[in-house]
Regions:
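Glycine-rich phosphate/diphosphate-binding loops that line cofactor/substrate pockets in enzymes
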Residues: 69-74
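Charged phosphate-binding loop/patch that engages nucleotide di/tri-phosphates or the phosphate backbone
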Residues: 172-201
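Alpha-helical scaffolding segments of alpha/beta enzyme cores, especially the outer helices
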Residues: 65-68, 91-102, 134
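Canonical Radical SAM [4Fe-4S] cluster-binding loop centered on the CxxxCxxC motif
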Residues: 2-61
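Core AdoMet radical
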Residues: 47-61, 75-89, 103-128, 132-150, ...
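Residues that form or flank phosphate/diphosphate-binding pockets in enzymes
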Residues: 38, 88-91
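A generic local structural motif
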Residues: 13-15, 66-68, 128-130
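Short, acidic Gly/Pro/Ser/Thr-rich loop/turn segments
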Residues: 35-39, 149, 180-182
C-alpha cells in the first residue's frame, strides 16, 4: 500500500510562513497530528491546537499527489511545512519533500524536535532512520525547537520573514543544505532571538 500523509489544509499564498524573494509569499502546508500534544504535553501556547488530532476530518493523500497539487496551484516555488508535528509522519513526509524538490521548490520545515534529536534518530531509529536522512536530502531550512509563549517574538505584521513566521526566540533556524553535500558538520544554526530578519536571495 502506498504511504498516505495526513494534512489539515494548504494555504496557497501566505506572507507569514518565512522568507522568499517574491515578497515573502510562500505556500504553507499544514500537517495533521502531534503525538506530544495528544499525550498531554503540548508546547506552551501552541498556535495550532486544532491540528493535534490526526484522525478527525484528516485528509489523507499520497505524497506524490500532494506535491503535484502544490506544483499546479502554488504561485511560486517556495513552500513551508508546519503542523501539528510534521515529523510524526516522517516516512510520507520524506516522500513529499522529495517530490517537492523534484518540482523545484525551496522547502522550510518547522518541527518541535531539535536537530540533535533528529540526527540521533537517523542512526538510532531502526524503522525510520533512513526516512529522516531522506528528508534532509531535500529540506533547505529547518526551524526547530518547541514554541514557548514566554519567549514569543511572533508579529504577523513584521514583514521580515522571521518575526512574522517564527513563534519564539528559543527556536533555531538551520541551513541544512550541507546534508545534501554529505557533510552534516557544515550545518549552520542561529537562534531566532538573535536574528534581525530572515531573507532568501
Amino acid at each position: 500500500m502506498d504511504s498516505i500523509l495526513k494534512i489539515y489544509d494548504v494555504k496557497w499564498t501566505s506572507n507569514t510562513a518565512g522568507p522568499s524573494p517574491d515578497g515573502n509569499r510562500r505556500t504553507e502546508i499544514f500537517i495533521r497530528g502531534c503525538k506530544k500534544a495528544a499525550e498531554g504535553n503540548p508546547c506552551n501556547g501552541c498556535f495550532n491546537p486544532k491540528l493535534w488530532n490526526d484522525t478527525d476530518t484528516a485528509i489523507g493523500r499520497p505524497p506524490r499527489e500532494i506535491a503535484e497539487m502544490v506544483d499546479e496551484h502554488a504561485p511560486n516555488k517556495f513552500v513551508t511545512i508546519v503542523g501539528g508535528e510534521p515529523l510524526d509522519q516522517v516516512r510520507p513526509l520524506a516522500e513529499l519533500v522529495s517530490w517537492l524538490k523534484f518540482y523545484g521548490f525551496h522547502i522550510i520545515l518547522f518541527t518541535h524536535y531539535t536537530l540533535e534529536e533528529i540526527k540521533i534518530a537517523t542512526v538510532a531509529d531502526e524503522e525510520y532512520g533512513d526516512d529522516y536522512l531522506a528528508l534532509f536530502q531535500n529540506v533547505d531550512v529547518l526551524v526547530d525547537g518547541e514554541y514557548d509563549a514566554s519567549q514569543r517574538i511572533y508579529d504577523d505584521e513584521a514583514g521580515d520573514g522571521l518575526h512574522d513566521a517564527i513563534g519564539s526566540a528559543n527556536q533555531v533556524v538551520w541551513d541544512i543544505r550541507g546534508w545534501r553535500k554529505g557533510d552534516s558538520g557544515t550545518i549552520d544554526g542561529l537562534r531566532a532571538g538573535d536574528l534581525a530578519g530572515l531573507y532568501i536571495c
